[in-house]
Amino acid sequence: MFENTETNGPVNCSFCGKSQDQVKKIVAGPGVYICNECIDLCKEIIDEEFSEEQTHELTDIPTPKEIVDELDQYVIGQNEAKRTLSVAVYNHYKRVKAMADNDEETEDGPELQKSNISLVGPTGSGKTFLAQSLARILDVPFAIADATTLTEAGYVGEDVENILLKLLQNADYDVERAEKGIIYIDEIDKIAKKSENVSITRDVSGEGVQQALLKILEGTIANVPPQGGRKHPQQEFIQIDTTNILFIVGGAFDGIEDIVKRRLGDKTIGFGTDTDGKNAVLDDSKSLMQQVVPEDLLQFGLIPEFIGRLPILTALERLTEDDLVRILTEPKNALVKQYQRLIALDGAELDFNDDALRAIAQEALARNTGARGLRSIIEDTMRDIMYDIPSREDVKKVIITRETVADHAEPELVLADQKAS
């Protein structure tokens, strides 16, 4: 037992070497001494490590409404998708927290299975950004994977376990934190079977990849090579439990509207058809994309087992011109605000008039790139301006017009001794 002892000879701390005269207390043990300063330092180290461990715990999970409110600050439109995602994510992390707390209901009641998510929507509708925003709101590690780079074991390409490696890297190789992260797999529609007919040849990047993903989607102990690449027997692995990792898959699923149209059309053929048109394709209350069901994904080429591990399905609408204009100006990190900040650092103001914003949105629609293409259009418009402004101390304000966007005309400049008209 350690105690504060009086000794006849000089006593020094066994850790820092300070004498009894240099510190307030020295605690003695069998053949060892420690001073009060070293005790305080040890306590700080232990408290710091304990606090780092505590950060892995999910304490205050935001409610679905709080998640949507946060998403609304960054994501324009897609209200139905935001509500669906907020409920799904809330239930997922509520389940994770219950399992971590060893809740009695978890032990005695029904097992809470995880619900991964499918996002269906055109290019540039915000699928990736929604997934990224959810991870930021929940403060969990996040990784993006491209399904087209994956192949099944034995073929040239990436193993599916490399998806987990990206998540682990983004969690600073903290396995426990990575096991509560979110993985978004993009271009999932590109690994659909090419046809419903069974082929003699192997579908290396299609059904085989879907089969390879099944285990990690459902929950398994995966062996992840720390350096990535292909696995081999002599290699060391990091084991990751995917049970509590939320998987969100997304794809444009080009042509799925035709599948929905055929399905809805079949329902309106024959006796007993609804004459009021409630089941008709042209029902304005919902777009074709909003009426996608798992059966349509099956027809598209995803296998039943894969669809079954993605029980939550939500669709994103194609963004309209009005949506794109709002995306340019309203979110906290809106592109217009970003470029205004950049120009302000050079001592000038930047203004996009309404016609200019409309022209940018129309160009994005013409390119069929959705919100994803907005930055490149603005960058193309602003390149010469950002080249000249740092050298022009006389410029007070830059006004971007429709002609600046559409025809690469010179912007309107307000000089220091002028006033805007």
From Swiss-Prot:
Residues 1-54 form the ClpX-type ZB domain. InterPro entries: AAA+_ATPase, ATP-dep_Clp_protease_ClpX, ATPase_AAA_core, Clp_ATPase_C, Clp_protease_ATP-bd_su_ClpX, ClpX_bact, P-loop_NTPase, Znf_CppX_C4. GO terms for molecular function: ATP binding; ATP hydrolysis activity; ATP-dependent protein folding chaperone; protein dimerization activity; unfolded protein binding; zinc ion binding. SMART domains: AAA, ClpB_D2-small, zf-C4_ClpX. It comes from the Bacteria. One of its GO terms (biological process) is proteolysis involved in protein catabolic process. The keyword ATP-binding applies. CDD domains: RecA-like_ClpX. ATP binds at residues 122-129. It holds the Pfam family ClpB_D2-small. Keywords: ATP-binding, Chaperone, Metal-binding, Nucleotide-binding, Zinc. Zn(2+) binds at residues 13, 16, 35, 38. GO terms for cellular component: HslUV protease complex. PANTHER family: ATP-DEPENDENT CLP PROTEASE ATP-BINDING SUBUNIT CLPX-LIKE, MITOCHONDRIAL, ATP-DEPENDENT CLP PROTEASE ATP-BINDING SUBUNIT CLPX-LIKE, MITOCHONDRIAL-RELATED. Belongs to the ClpX chaperone family. Component of the ClpX-ClpP complex. Forms a hexameric ring that, in the presence of ATP, binds to fourteen ClpP subunits assembled into a disk-like structure with a central cavity, resembling the structure of eukaryotic proteasomes. ATP-dependent specificity component of the Clp protease. It directs the protease to specific substrates. Can perform chaperone functions in the absence of ClpP. This is ATP-dependent Clp protease ATP-binding subunit ClpX. The lineage of its organism: Bacteria, Bacillati, Bacillota, Bacilli, Lactobacillales.
